[in-house]
Amino acid sequence: RMLDYVFLCFFLGNDFLPHFPSLNIRTNGIHILLDAYKNIIGNKQDCFLLSKTYQTGIKIEWKQLYKLLLELSKNERNLWKQEYGLRSKWDKKPVMLHQKGTSKEKTELFQNTPVLYRKEEKYINPYQHCWEERYYQVLFSKNVCKENIISNYLEGIEWVSNYYFSGQVDWSWKYKFHYPPLLKDMIPKISTIKTTILPKRKTKPVPPLVQLAYVLPPIYHHLLPTTVDSTILDKQTGIPLHSNGLPNIEFQWAFCRYFWECHVKLPEIELY
């Protein structure tokens, strides 16, 4: 059961996958998951979300995951409404633009940006008809197919399981989006999965200095060792810059609580 508990927590978000707005760790997300697990799987003998054998290692039991997500999806819209209602309370609080405020007041205002400016969330509005379509319309690129989002997320569930439980992963894999698909939209796809879905591909982890080179703004590249290949640094040229040389970056904060949780929109950098 311990492995199942860890696996459940993947749906609350981690370093590799975003959390579901309807399953927020701040608003009883873990209890919602555990209640669904208790109702569907409980202590049934030989009934788990993950199985482990010497031959295959850790394996997702997709049939059981289907049942669990089906249970969660039945209440998905209500969970969205609850989360939306909690965040709507911030609309009643006046936004004081502390132009002459203290440094602490300005920092607090800045960090509260995601709950003070909720344009995208208000447009989605789960209380109104067709909110699901608006969710994908606002939070994903127009040319993205919903099926690709679903497949990519389900790959991610398997990838993260392999990463934490066996360490044998394709280091080139990534989840390509800032938000997950809706729970109900994953149900049809999961019902067709019988075995592993990730293609086997042998890759090496990205070297630490290369990782550092990719996250450092260009104006700080002089801090890197001279051994770092210049072609690596050249790949950052796609990031737009302000006139002062600092990166001109867009942020997306729908359903985030604090600004530091925002999703950063950056151009793709090919690693492999």
Regions found by a protein language model. Give the residues of each.
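Long, low-complexity, charge-dense
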Residues: 1-272
